[in-house]
């Protein structure tokens, strides 16, 4: 009976994934974000499910239904605030998780990495369609601007945009289908996350040193279960502080006004977690060029394993690469700031320089830094 977890067909899978899993003894707090993303996904599915019970995906009543949730539904305000700020926490954890993968060379587990990039794209799609649902001013105009980018595709663009809209502009049909997409995507993301974990467990976790840790492994439980539990508590603390004390801090004031197709906001921008990509999109004064740059800014992650030139896996002992990594981080923060600014000087030129630096760092400077570090480590006698 005591060893049922090792023999029962279902419990055996859980046991091999979360209890008796051999884990490197030296993984740091940067390895907490995978489990934190799992918690974020569960929070979002649960709060979203209860919100969907009261929401109506109709242009005439969508905005009112959200107001009704906040005013009349028991703890509806809390559900909405947790769901909206939970999305911000989700992306914060995602960016840190990807950053950790780049810093410590985890991208060399190619299958795990590629599924992770697909997951990132799917979560971004889910967040975009979800942002449209409250049918506020910025929801509507954000949807109009971003879906309109499809029309930049040669020959089929306009047809494709109208197919997505279900008409000649963003309207009732668009809102209804976006709600359907937003509801189904978490149930696509969950199995993808399980496959992501499956491939990770084929190789075992990477560790800060980047050296094969097989000679020094410890069981996942209790060591890393307690460590993850601490992460959960900190995540929930930050989420509750956001949701209870400043729920609208990361939102857009324009979304307090119902969508009005006849009145364009002076400055259309997405949520903060898309601003870096939005800045790259805007930095190119050509519609198709901007769309290609936007796609490249995310899809570039897929070729990072091919750009690894260093003899060492991790950046832990590579100061030149470390410096470039932190310049890249600062550059992404700059792009996020620029994405939220109006299209005028000096923001235009800063955005263009930051966009150019983003691609130069990843495609040119970091691979060269790896080769330079290899050369410096060679014995010179």
UniProtKB/Swiss-Prot annotation:
Location(s) in or outside the cell: Mitochondrion inner membrane
CDD domains (UniProt xref): cytochrome_b_C, Cytochrome_b_N
User: Which InterPro entries does this UniProt record tie to the protein?
Assistant: Cyt_b/b6_C (IPR005798), Cyt_b/b6_C_sf (IPR036150), Cyt_b/b6_N (IPR005797), Cytb/b6-like_sf (IPR027387), Cytochrome_b (IPR030689), Cytochrome_b_C_euk/bac (IPR048260), Cytochrome_b_N_euk/bac (IPR048259), Di-haem_cyt_TM (IPR016174)
Protein's UniProt keywords contain Iron-sulfur: no
Obligatory cofactor(s): heme b
Q: Where does a ubiquinone bind?
A: 201
Keywords linked to the UniProt accession? Electron transport, Heme, Iron, Membrane, Metal-binding, Mitochondrion, Mitochondrion inner membrane, Respiratory chain, Transmembrane, Transmembrane helix, Transport, Ubiquinone
What is a biological process (GO) this protein takes part in?
mitochondrial electron transport, ubiquinol to cytochrome c
Mark the transmembrane ranges.
Answer: 33-53, 77-98, 113-133, 178-198, 226-246, 288-308, 320-340, 347-367
The membrane topology of this protein is: Multi-pass membrane protein
Q: Where does heme b b566 bind?
A: 97, 196
Highest taxon listed in the record's lineage: Eukaryota
Q: Which GO terms describe its molecular function?
A: metal ion binding; ubiquinol-cytochrome-c reductase activity
**Which positions in this protein are listed as binding heme b b562?**
83, 182
**Which family is annotated?**
Belongs to the cytochrome b family.
The record's subunit annotation is: The cytochrome bc1 complex contains 11 subunits: 3 respiratory subunits (MT-CYB, CYC1 and UQCRFS1), 2 core proteins (UQCRC1 and UQCRC2) and 6 low-molecular weight proteins (UQCRH/QCR6, UQCRB/QCR7, UQCRQ/QCR8, UQCR10/QCR9, UQCR11/QCR10 and a cleavage product of UQCRFS1). This cytochrome bc1 complex then forms a dimer.
Q: What is this protein called?
A: Cytochrome b
